[in-house]
């Protein structure tokens, strides 16, 4: 196991197109860090730079105590798991697992020991003599992970490994990957655009936006205290409701809210909004009169899509099956502890 340190890492193409803009990050020994962000934010490029598949323009990357800027990928003591399984179709599972080790002149007895250990951990012992075409998508992904595990590397790098799987299998595999990483204790960097994967798997999240880091923290820290409007809207589904200043007759901040001078954006998550029944006091964080436009039942809860009196959208969640009707007018509110205030620059105003 090894820590990974990025110090002011930059990547430019053609000398003037900068895609990674001074990223500094320390990943602790044994930590599972997820790089997350929209398409084009630089997360896969950054992972490939750690792996040595992309050169860096400036800065340093260290794995363990060694600066690896000019070290070949094969010498960095890392193992990658890709979106595409990249298995040799003419080889058995056993041969696929052994291939890289044979190229490194690993003794035969050691190869067999590592294969047996990985196969047991991944529960693929019964598939060792099969070829990839005889396996399901989930089984192939386990083999791809096994090929990384037998390397016994200092770090695992995962590049959107679940993207080709169906929704049910993705849930199963993300649990398995996290369980496996915890049992092995291997430093891991995982790239995804799927916030559900990011939130459920990460020890820490790194949210990237246009080549720079927006925020680093645990999933709950980013969810409860987003550092910017970008993070607030990217983390969480449905997305956080955002209302621009100045407030109007359509909505009002509560009596317990202190607003910054100048422009601001007021945020509240769908699950923090409640319907105020007749006779309720106004909520101390946020109040609005809304018209219900649509109701989505998603099993144990319903999402209500509504409109403020000025036409701006608002979405909120209620438990179970909603009994409210389309075009019904309701008053909603939120507590002061559940609202988020962002300044004119889009950054969070200190609580």
From Swiss-Prot:
What protein name applies here?
sn-glycerol-3-phosphate import ATP-binding protein UgpC
What organism is this sequence from?
Brucella melitensis biotype 1 (strain ATCC 23456 / CCUG 17765 / NCTC 10094 / 16M)
Output the Gene Ontology cellular-component terms.
ATP-binding cassette (ABC) transporter complex, substrate-binding subunit-containing
Q: Report the locations given in the UniProt record.
A: Cell inner membrane
Subunit text:
The complex is composed of two ATP-binding proteins (UgpC), two transmembrane proteins (UgpA and UgpE) and a solute-binding protein (UgpB).
* Top EC class of this enzyme: translocase
Its annotated function is as follows:
Part of the ABC transporter complex UgpBAEC involved in sn-glycerol-3-phosphate (G3P) import. Responsible for energy coupling to the transport system.
Q: Taking every annotated instance into account, which residue ranges of this chain make up the domain ABC transporter?
A: 4-235
The UniProt entry's GO biological process terms, in alphabetical order, are: carbohydrate transport; glycerophosphodiester transmembrane transport
Give the reactions, separated by semicolons, that this protein catalyses: sn-glycerol 3-phosphate(out) + ATP + H2O = sn-glycerol 3-phosphate(in) + ADP + phosphate + H(+)
User: What keyword terms does UniProt attach to this protein?
Assistant: ATP-binding, Cell inner membrane, Cell membrane, Membrane, Nucleotide-binding, Sugar transport, Translocase, Transport
The protein's matches in InterPro entries, at most eight in alphabetical order, are given as: AAA+_ATPase, ABC_transporter-like_ATP-bd, ABC_transporter-like_CS, ABC_transpr_MalK-like, ABC_transpr_MalK/UgpC-like, Mo/tungstate-bd_C_term_dom, NA-bd_OB-fold, P-loop_NTPase
GO-annotated molecular function: ABC-type glycerol-3-phosphate transporter activity; ATP binding; ATP hydrolysis activity
- Binding residues for ATP, per the UniProt record? 37-44
- UniProt family annotation: Belongs to the ABC transporter superfamily. sn-glycerol-3-phosphate importer (TC 3.A.1.1.3) family.
Give the gene symbol. Answer: ugpC
Which Pfam families does the protein's record reference?
Answer: ABC_tran, TOBE_2
Q: What is its main location?
A: membrane
